[in-house]
Amino acid sequence: MVGAAAAEAATVRYYSVAPDVRLNVRSGPGTSYGIIRVLPEGAKVPIYCQTPGTSVSGPYGTSNIWDNISNGEYVSDAYVNTGSDGYVADRCS
């Protein structure tokens, strides 16, 4: 198992997206990847694993961490309230 599939075997926590933000979900860990969909305001996301990518500035600071929220779907950690500036989940493999 790899990526989100492997992480699904573990306990997954859900985290809130920053208030008043419609967050782009991308096909990879960076702003150069295509937008797959947009999360609505008030969304909560699971974090299956995290990986480094494009550095992004958002409500929770500047971060190069990207959160894998589903198979092939990533959001910038700078927009997710994890309570930490670092990794809160295993790194994606």
Protein language model features and the residues they cover:
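A generic alpha-helix preference that emphasizes hydrophobic side chains
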Residues: 4-6, 66
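Short alpha-helix capping/helix-loop boundary micro-motifs
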Residues: 29-34
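SH3-family beta-barrel domains
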Residues: 6-27, 38-41, 86-93
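SH3/SH3-like beta-barrel superfamily modules
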Residues: 37-85
